Amino acid sequence: MTPIELSTRRRVTGLTSDEFARLFVSLQREVDGEAAQWSATDVESWELVGPPVTAEQHLIDTFAAANEFVSTLADRLYHTIMPVTEDSVITAYSDDITFWGSHPDLGGVPHALWNIAVLQAAEWARKETGIICELDVRKPLV
């Protein structure tokens, strides 16, 4: 995977370099039978110098996990807000700490993935009903 491909694929997920790097590190597993030892700083640098060959499959798996999370969550949120009304409100988060405080079971997942799923669910509801959900953005806890 070239640096430009990595950068482009990361941007498509909606994550910043830092958010993607932290997600990648949190999902690390073994590489060639040994525990992977990459740091978030290593992962961020790969957008400039390219990732090591040993990280390539793990990068692909991380992108797939992020996309699957957003797809599954958007579907859950859509079914939660339906039937949508003029008073329907859906919550987005402005930072990870506030998001994790509201959803401790999702600790470690970047708030950006939640927000993408929220927007996708709201768009599906709008297309089906013509009603636009209000978006409530939670202020940071700190």
What are these regions (language model features)?
Residues 1-13:
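A short, Lys/Arg-rich alpha-helix, primarily the initiator
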Residues 6, 20-21, 43-46:
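Conserved hydrophobic/aromatic packing and binding residues within compact polymer-binding modules
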Residues 12, 23, 127-128:
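Residues at alpha-helix termini
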Residues 25-29, 68, 126:
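A general structural signal for alpha-helical elements within enzymatic catalytic domains
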Residues 25-54:
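Recognition helix of helix-turn-helix/homeodomain-like DNA-binding domains
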